[in-house]
Amino acid sequence: MLRLAVATQQETFERIRDPLAVRDIEVVPVRASERTLSLSSPDLPSVDAGLVFPSRLMEGGAVSAALDVPWVNDREAILTSRNKAEVLAALSTAGVPTPETTLVSNPVDDDSVAAAAETLQTRTDTAELVIKPNSTTRGTGVARVADPDSLLGVTDYLDLVHDFRATGDRSFLLQEYLPDARDYRAMIVDGEYAGAVKRRLPEAETAAGKWKHNVHRGAVAEGVALSEAARELAERTADVLGIDYLGVDLLETDDRLVVNETNARPTVDDATKYEPGFYDRLAALIRKTAESR
């Protein structure tokens, strides 16, 4: 039986364990962070491949070196997808539609930020913008602003957080806000569409003024059948980025369909929300990865 190291969220581990077991793949948990690890004689399981490179790059690097196996999504794939600006620039250059976005390489002065926001608002003919840290996940630190004072207030907070945590990435994005956009997460496995969910907020949450569609922020993920255009867009995104196993976030309005973000560490949802052959294709990709060793 092939043994697969999994260092992703607990919910993904629980969901993929049994379906992969019946396909002769044993899912083995590997913890890369919040632990002690002897580098001289690391206490790690014997595995044939890994699913996705651990989220903490330093600890992940040590664990990956000790395991000495290929990953379905390696460090390069994780770094590429985590850099939202790089993803959007690559997709835009390849002709893949994305929201109008400006990268702010912090620190910059208030006048420069305000000028960039005004230019973006003029180009998109919209008053509201979304501001987000370039490397954020799960909607952390993402805000919606409609006036200069609110915008600069958010950047003030970003400056404080950056200084306190001495983070390596201080950049952030200014992005057009697409009101009433439908939010989808498409799953790509080995370059092909494998299913999708629509993420929506309960009506009570929307009525209360919430707008973020992240599941970890209270949104509900429902299995949907995407249009052919949306499927092709998600597949094209994975092809441009060169990432075999990818979550592609799509926003759709009445007249636009764009790629908003990607996730090379996607949470696996219930099997009923994916195409019937999802686990067969995932197992085949894992085996192909192990054979590349």
Where do the language-model regions lie?
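A long amphipathic alpha-helix within ATP-dependent nucleotide-binding catalytic cores
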Residues: 208-256, 281, 285-293
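Short glycine-rich anion-binding loops that position phosphate/pyrophosphate groups of nucleotides
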Residues: 55-57, 134-136, 265
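Protein kinase-like catalytic core scaffold
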Residues: 129, 194-195, 258-261
